[in-house]
Amino acid sequence: MSSRFSLTVVCLIALLPFVVGIRLIPARITSVGDGGGGGGNNGFSKLGPFMEAPEYRNGKECVSSSVNRENFVSSSSSSNDPSLVHIAMTLDSEYLRGSIAAVHSVLRHASCPENVFFHFIAAEFDSASPRVLSQLVRSTFPSLNFKVYIFREDTVINLISSSIRLALENPLNYARNYLGDILDRSVERVIYLDSDVITVDDITKLWNTVLTGSRVIGAPEYCHANFTQYFTSGFWSDPALPGLISGQKPCYFNTGVMVMDLVRWREGNYREKLEQWMQLQKKMRIYDLGSLPPFLLVFAGNVEAIDHRWNQHGLGGDNIRGSCRSLHPGPVSLLHWSGKGKPWVRLDEKRPCPLDHLWEPYDLYKHKIERAKDQSLLGFASLSELTDDSSFL
């Protein structure tokens, strides 16, 4: 796949043990009505309906994975298969539609889709049980390699402070802090993705990022950032706190797309380092933006810089209004609707932003077909056409 490409907008109806306390939900479910977890058909039907995704198979150039769909759940050795690309995402009822679209986009553009292994982290007390969520993923992606883990919210609930936006206070938002504890020890490297992204390029390119030196994470970063906007006046006026980060380069990065070395993460006790800042936040308010500031305090200036094409973030607008945004200049491999506005919500409310139509071809929600019957297709031909149109600036 070339570095620059055209993403065709297709017809809307086309099928395109630490204290964390986790439990594993079997990924291979044969019956939607399997009643475990209190969900059954009832909980399942409330979340759907989703169309079954097309089968995406490896090309001849792919190294065959040793994962067997019939037994990979119980085999920890399968997680250590060097041919696998490991991706971690959260899974909950509110963002389920986004998660399904994200998975679909990864598989559609992956050069070796059968070698992609998803690790889904589900909340213990979500309105849809983790078992029901697992069933829905299996029915939508019958051949997908994945595991579902239950994240106990009491692991982090007492460390969470109020934020600028209520959604940022969701305990599942902090699951990324605990991936080193949640995932099998045999998983030594993982890509973390937020649920409001789609990829339009081969995820293997991101997976192949080299974390040089002792770097623990890689992400698109923006240096020379104004850090005063990420921390409160109480932080900057404290006689000691600013000095703790004075030697770090002021580099901002979005934690919705990260390549993580879990071996270095575990060895460096980075979960504890993040928690220390969260504990301080409970005593004195030093930031307002949820789970991001602790990452900046711990990692800023020591992140492996990844091409900005791998996180075109901010497409959900700001945290208050969720206004429409345009793409950043340059090529695009991943689009990220961080911010208040989510494409599936705006599309359903018939007030989409122009870039939301780039997300829609990956949407497997069945009700979108009914909506498409009442809408004429927009005249957008490609991603490049959207970025070149001055009306989106």
Swiss-Prot record:
Glycans are attached at N226. Residues 26-393 are lumenal. It is an enzyme of class 2 (transferase). GO terms for molecular function: polygalacturonate 4-alpha-galacturonosyltransferase activity. GO terms for cellular component: Golgi membrane. It comes from the Eukaryota. Keywords: Cell wall biogenesis/degradation, Glycoprotein, Glycosyltransferase, Golgi apparatus, Membrane, Signal-anchor, Transferase, Transmembrane, Transmembrane helix. GO terms for biological process: cell wall organization; pectin biosynthetic process. Coiled coil: none annotated. Belongs to the glycosyltransferase 8 family. This is Probable galacturonosyltransferase-like 8. It comes from Arabidopsis thaliana. The lineage of its organism: Eukaryota, Viridiplantae, Streptophyta, Embryophyta, Tracheophyta. The gene is GATL8.
